[in-house]
Swiss-Prot record:
Transports zinc ions across cell and organelle membranes into the cytoplasm and regulates intracellular zinc homeostasis. Participates in the zinc ions efflux out of the secretory compartments. Regulates intracellular zinc level, resulting in the enhancement of AKT1 and MAPK3/MAPK1 (Erk1/2) phosphorylation in response to the BCR activation. Also functions as a membrane androgen receptor that mediates, through a G protein, the non-classical androgen signaling pathway, characterized by the activation of MAPK3/MAPK1 (Erk1/2) and transcription factors CREB1 or ATF1. The gene is slc39a9-b. PANTHER family: SOLUTE CARRIER FAMILY 39 ZINC TRANSPORTER , MEMBER 9-RELATED, ZINC TRANSPORTER ZIP9. The keyword Ribosomal protein does not apply. One of its GO terms (molecular function) is G protein-coupled receptor activity. This is Zinc transporter ZIP9-B. Belongs to the ZIP transporter (TC 2.A.5) family. It is a multi-pass membrane protein. It comes from Xenopus laevis. GO terms for cellular component: mitochondrial membrane; mitochondrion; nucleus; perinuclear region of cytoplasm; plasma membrane; trans-Golgi network. The chain crosses the membrane at residues 7-27, 35-55, 102-122, 142-162, 172-192, 206-226, 240-260, 282-302. It is found in: Golgi apparatus, trans-Golgi network membrane; Cell membrane; Cytoplasm, Perinuclear region; Mitochondrion.
Length: 303
C-alpha cells in the first residue's frame, strides 16, 4: 500500500471515529444531573488525555525520530571509519538531548500561549456586548471549540509529517495516539457544549468542524510537502513538535476553560463565594475516573 492510500484511509478512520464518539452524548437523553456528571467525566477525559497521552506521545515521537536519525548517521560513520574514540560521540549525544529538551518546553509553551492569545482576542471582542455574563459564556464555547480545532489541526500536521517519512510503524503509532485522545476529546467537547446550553444543531456543526480538522490538515500536509521539505522536517522532528504544540493548546482548553466551567467557577469574577459550590463527591469521582481512563488506555498501548 502506498503512502497516499494509507494516509487517506487513516484520515477517513479518524473522521468517522471522532464524529461517532462525539455523537454519543447527543444520542442519549440525559437528565440535568446526569448531564452534569457526563460533562465532568468529559472534562476529566480532556485533562487525563492531555497529560497521560499527548505529552508522552509527543516526547516519544521527538526522541524516536532523533534516535532513528542517530542510528542512520552512526551506520554511515561506521562504514567510513571503524575505529573512533567514543568521547566526541558522547558529547554530541548530550548536546542532541539538550536540544530535544528545549524543543519539548518551547513547543508546549507556544501551544499554551497561542491559545491564551486566541482566548484574549476572542473575549475582548465578546466583552463589548451589553450582557458581559452572556458574552463570557459565548466566548467560552467558541474558545473551547476553537482550541480543540487548533489542537486537531496540529495533530493532522503531525500525522501528515509522519506519513511523509514513509515509515508505516511511525504512521500507525501517531495514528493510534491521535485516536486515543480524539475520541475522548470529541466526547468531552460535546458534553461541555451541551452543559453550556448550545442547541443540538450548533453542537453537531462544532463537532463536524473538530472531526474534519485533523484529516484535512494531515492530507494537506502530506500533499504539500516536497521531497526537500520532508528531509528538512525530519531534521527538526516535525511530528514530535506538532504533537507537543497541540498538547499545549489542549492543556489550555482543558484546564483554563472546561475544568473551571464544570466546577461552577467559570471565568466569572463573582464575589459571591456561594455561587462557586464546587463538585459533589460523585462528580469528583467522575472527574478522577475521566482523568484515569486515558492513562489506562495509554498503558495498554505500549510501544
Amino acid at each position: 500500500m502506498d503512502d497516499f492510500t494509507s494516509i487517506s484511509l487513516l484520515s477517513l478512520a479518524m473522521l468517522v471515529g471522532c464524529y461517532v464518539s462525539g455523537i454519543i452524548p447527543l444520542a442519549v437523553n440525559f437528565s440535568e444531573e446526569k448531564l452534569k456528571l457526563v460533562t465532568v467525566l468529559g472534562a476529566g477525559l480532556l485533562c487525563g488525555t492531555a497529560l497521560a497521552v499527548i505529552v508522552p506521545e509527543g516526547v516519544h515521537a521527538l526522541y524516536e525520530e532523533a534516535l532513528e536519525a542517530k542510528h542512520h548517521e552512526m551506520g554511515e560513520i561506521h562504514k567510513v571509519k571503524d575505529a573512533e574514540t567514543g568521547a566526541e560521540a558522547s558529547v554530541a549525544h548530550e548536546h542532541d538531548h539538550s536540544n530535544l529538551h528545549a524543543y519539548i518546553g518551547v513547543s508546549l509553551v507556544l501551544g499554551f500561549v497561542f491559545m491564551l492569545l486566541v482566548d484574549q482576542i476572542g473575549s475582548s471582542h465578546m466583552h463589548s456586548a451589553d450582557d458581559p455574563e452572556a458574552a463570557r459564556a459565548a466566548s467560552s464555547k467558541i474558545t473551547t471549540t476553537l482550541g480543540l480545532v487548533v489542537h486537531a489541526a496540529a495533530d493532522g500536521v503531525a500525522l501528515g509529517a509522519a506519513a511523509s517519512t514513509s515509515q508505516t510503524s511511525v504512521q500507525l503509532i501517531v495514528f493510534v495516539a491521535i485516536m486515543l485522545h480524539k475520541a475522548p476529546a470529541a466526547f468531552g467537547l460535546v458534553s461541555f457544549l451541551m452543559h453550556a446550553g448550545l442547541e443540538r444543531n450548533r453542537i453537531r456543526k462544532h463537532l463536524l468542524v473538530f472531526a474534519l480538522a485533523a484529516p484535512l490538515l494531515s492530507m494537506l500536509t502530506y500533499l504539500g510537502l516536497s521531497k526537500s521539505s520532508k528531509e528538512a522536517l525530519s531534521e527538526v522532528n516535525a511530528t514530535g513538535v506538532a504533537m507537543l504544540f497541540s498538547a499545549g493548546t489542549f492543556l489550555y482548553v482543558a484546564t483554563v476553560h472546561v475544568l473551571p466551567e464544570v466546577g461552577g467557577m467559570g471565568h466569572s469574577h463573582k464575589q459571591d463565594l456561594g455561587a462557586a459550590k464546587g463538585l459533589s463527591r460523585l462528580e469528583v469521582c467522575a472527574l478522577v475516573l475521566g482523568c484515569l481512563i486515558p492513562l489506562v488506555l495509554s498503558i495498554g498501548h505500549q510501544h
